[in-house]
Curated annotation (Swiss-Prot):
Subcellular compartments: Nucleus
Phylogenetic lineage: Eukaryota, Fungi, Dikarya, Ascomycota, Pezizomycotina
Descriptive protein name: U1 small nuclear ribonucleoprotein C
Compositionally skewed regions (Pro residues) per UniProt: 90-107, 136-149, 156-183, 201-213
Gene3D superfamilies in UniProt: Classic Zinc Finger
Described function: Component of the spliceosomal U1 snRNP, which is essential for recognition of the pre-mRNA 5' splice-site and the subsequent assembly of the spliceosome. U1-C is directly involved in initial 5' splice-site recognition for both constitutive and regulated alternative splicing. The interaction with the 5' splice-site seems to precede base-pairing between the pre-mRNA and the U1 snRNA. Stimulates commitment or early (E) complex formation by stabilizing the base pairing of the 5' end of the U1 snRNA and the 5' splice-site region.
InterPro entries associated with the record: Matrin/U1-C_Znf_C2H2, U1-CZ_Znf_C2H2, U1_snRNP-C, Znf_C2H2_sf
Keyword Metal-binding in record: yes
Stretches the record annotates as Disordered: 60-242
Regions of compositional bias (Polar residues) in chain numbering: 231-242
GO molecular function: mRNA binding; pre-mRNA 5'-splice site binding; U1 snRNA binding; zinc ion binding
Top-rank taxon, per record: Eukaryota
One Gene Ontology cellular component: commitment complex
Disulphide-bonded residues: none
Length: 242
């Protein structure tokens, strides 16, 4: 099958781009083209040139991106103007970079910056332990952990900011605080009653109870002042036989 060449009556053996390029670059084809335009006249030749140019331009736009709908094509929606919403369910276009409405330092293209980045506020600081500074603890906060080897119910945990400068510590042995340990002995149990406790306090080991006779004497016998106390004597041999 033969194919007619461009602007001439020469038939080609193949309708391919390489064959047509080889034919159009030949000397016979160029001579035939010149004779063709001379025969049709200047006005008709200009109209033919314009129609060919427009067809090539339309084919070039369609071949560059055939999946993209050009504005004004059938079935294509025109882009919404700035400040007006688009189709239902479609996000409005972001303001261009540098136009009013865009924050200073915003990235181009309407991208959302990460928190803490340029154009966004920094991360909020974490809340302090135990509520705000100097205030009560926030609802739902856990109590602070107790110190190691600290008896429960004696000294409360200090506030978050520490004790005030004019805070006075109670003297040793006061109610609710253990007495100082005796040198050479381990930690002893507190003998002072706690706040609200009633009754006679229990003395430490080796000391008599309040109101009891001294060690070695029976109850009800109290020597007069100035008389030395006699230690309790063990029974003799004569008394053991009786």
């Amino acid at each position: 099958m033969n194919y007619l060449g461009d602007y001439c009556d020469v038939y080609l053996t193949h309708d391919s781009m390489s064959v047509r390029k080889a034919h159009n670059s030949g000397r016979n084809h160029l001579r035939n083209v010149v004779e063709y335009y001379q025969e049709i006249g200047h006005e008709k030749a200009q109209s033919v040139i314009d129609s060919i140019t427009n067809s090539y331009a339309a084919e070039g736009q369609a071949s560059s991106n055939p999946m993209l709908q050009q504005p004004g094509a059938p079935g294509a929606y025109p882009p919404p103007a700035f400040g007006f919403p688009g189709r239902p369910g479609m996000l409005p276009p972001p303001p261009p970079f540098g136009m009013p409405g865009a924050p200073p330092g915003a990235p181009p293209g309407g991208m959302i910056p990460l928190p803490g980045g340029r154009g966004m506020p920094p991360f909020p600081p974490p809340p302090p332990f135990g509520g705000t500074s100097g205030g009560p603890p926030m609802p739902g906060d856990l109590p602070p952990p107790p110190l190691p080897n600290m008896p429960s119910g004696n000294i409360p945990f200090p506030p978050p900011n520490g004790f005030p400068p004019n805070f006075q510590f109670p003297p040793p042995g006061a109610a609710g605080f253990p007495p100082p340990p005796i040198p050479g002995q381990g930690q002893t149990q507190s003998t002072s009653p706690g706040p609200g406790a009633t009754g006679t306090p229990v003395p430490p080991p080796g000391f008599p109870l309040p109101g009891a006779p001294p060690l070695g004497q029976s109850a009800g016998i109290t020597p007069p002042p100035g008389v030395p106390q006699k230690p309790a004597s063990s029974p003799g041999p004569s008394q053991e036989g009786k």
